[in-house]
Amino acid sequence: MCNALCECLKCPGKVVCCCCSCACKMLLSIVFSALLMVVVIGLIVYFTVFYHKDKNTDEVQKQVAQLTPIVKRSIRDYFNKEY
């Protein structure tokens, strides 16, 4: 009888432990996903705002003018491919 009572008490303990483990994994997943989003947004802001501040704007404009047709052509070719 005592053994049956002990087994009945183990089951809720296992369920609580499993739920806590799952909740901990989910919480860590959410935290690390948010951290990754902050890093990505920070890199985007850095490269769009601060990266080319010390360069001559004419030089940057020439680079953009050279790369724009290449990028447009490659995007157009990518979407026109037949699979």
Curated annotation (Swiss-Prot):
It comes from the Eukaryota. Keywords: Developmental protein. Endoderm-specific pattern of expression during embryogenesis; anterior and posterior midgut primordia. Involved in morphogenesis and development. This is Protein midgut expression 1. It comes from Drosophila melanogaster.
